Structure formats: C-alpha cells, structure tokens
Amino acid sequence: GAYIKSDNAADNNLAASTYKLPLTMLWYEKIANGEVSPTQEFEFTENMLEKEDEENPNQPIGAKYKVGDKIPLSNLLEAAALYSDNIAGHILFENLGGYSAFKHMATKYSEHQQSKDFFNENKLNPDYTMDLVRHLYETSGTYDDLKYWLTYAGPHMFLNYNNPHGYVQKVGNNEEIRNVIGYAPTLYPFSVCIYSQIGDKEGEKLIGDIGDICWAYFEQKYNNGDYEMYDSSLAESRMAIGSPQVALAYLPDLPVDQRSTLEHPHGKTNS
C-alpha cells in the first residue's frame, strides 16, 4: 500500500511509553512459539522500581506487588499494554537481558538500519514504528490478546480522542511529549505514527483531530473504490482481537479519562 512519511521519519525521538509496543510483541511472540508460558512468574527486584508517573498515576504493579514478589507474565503484559505500567515494562525488558538487548531483538520488526542511540536510549523513529505497526496488524493470532489490550487502553485519548476504540494504539506521554503509534482495524486499513513535543491537553486534542482526518480520508478512498484490489477477507482476519482473562483489579481512584475498564466489554475482574 501507499506509504507517506515526513522528511524526518528516520530521526530518533524520545519514545516515552511507545517502547512498550515492541517489548510486549516480543513476549507475545515467545508465548506463541512455546518458548514461555503466560503463567511463568518473574521476580520483582529492587532495581526494577520506577519513580511514580505523575501523568499516569496508580499503575497496578506498584500498587499490587512489592519488591520480592513473583508476578505472572500474563499480568505483566496486561499491565504494560493496558495501563502502560512502567515497572511492568522494566521487568519485561530486564528478563530479555536488559534494555539494549531488548532493542536489538526488536530490530527484526523493521528492515531499516538503526543508529547507536536507538539501542542505548529510549528512542524510536517513525521509519521503525510504521514497520512495527504493519507487522502487528498483518500477523493474525500471535498478538490478538495484545490488540485487545491496546483497543481498550485509554478509549478517549490521542487518536481515539473523538472516536473511542477506533484505533488500536500505543501512546506515550511525558511532560510536553505526546506520541502515538497505531492502526485502524477496518476494511480500509491504515496506520498512523506521531512523535511530537506538542504539549498536554491541547496536543492530545490535536492528535485526535489528526486521527479523525486520516480516518475520513481513507474511508473516502474506500468508498471511491481505491481498495478494490485489497483482499477484504484478509482484513477481517487481521481485525480479530483476543479475549484475555482480566487479572489485575482496577483501581477505583483512577482518573475518569483513564478508566478504560468502565467501557470494558467483559466487565469482570479478579483481585
């Protein structure tokens, strides 16, 4: 399909929590390949502690577990994908050999060559993430549970600001940084990647407007017959998402705009 990118698509940007998308993909791939069980437990050690995230408070791993506890992989993946939990992310990449080792593993999702700071710092670039999201979308089965969590993470945020559950997205925010990578699970699939220092609420609304513009544009192309050569049966299989067990108890003091759980289709939680 068509690929439109900005002139700086190869430039690395501060990734914020978008790094958790390739991280969780690697683990779901390991599960699918039988290399690890979702019930396998990983120890929460002191070096995995993360400072409190003021923009994403009440992250469940720090609230439910203490240093020394062992946490099932499935809980860590739920926390990292649905809540963007920083401790979960740290535990997951440490158990791949550390952050740099994880980033080297994750290069397989793109044919683009990466610079040194890609591996040593929390940075990503649109050339990489567009390939990453395409792989996520086109791979049926392996990532269905991950697609589920990403569908219900922040339904009124970023690309989904005006269109709850429209995009399957992973967001990243830290101070003025507002990043998002995602795709539209439709009969006219397309992906969007934005790395910005656009600011807080006004930036998030602007990203939502961009999401709406892209959606309308590709919907119009579909209505005009521009997708006639695309196999719609492929789209239907790739639109599938899983139905994983909800393991983490939702926290009642979570801000309303972060209560993905209120629109959760299953509505059941286990403490």
Predicted regions and their residues:
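Short, hydrophobic/aromatic-rich segments at coil-to-beta transitions
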Residues: 163-170
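N-terminal carbohydrate-binding/catalytic regions of secreted carbohydrate-active enzymes
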Residues: 1-4, 21
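Active-site-adjacent helix/loop patches that line small-molecule binding or acyl-intermediate pockets
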Residues: 46-47, 56-144
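Active-site SXXK
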Residues: 13-42, 80, 192
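Structured C-terminal helix/loop/strand segments within mature extracytoplasmic catalytic/sensor domains
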Residues: 3-4, 11-12, 100, 137-154, ...
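Structural recognition of the beta-strand scaffold that forms the well-ordered cores
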Residues: 16, 79, 91, 113-115, ...
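Short, well-structured active-site flanking segments
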Residues: 29-52, 142-147
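Extracytoplasmic
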Residues: 8-10, 14-19, 37-39, 87, ...
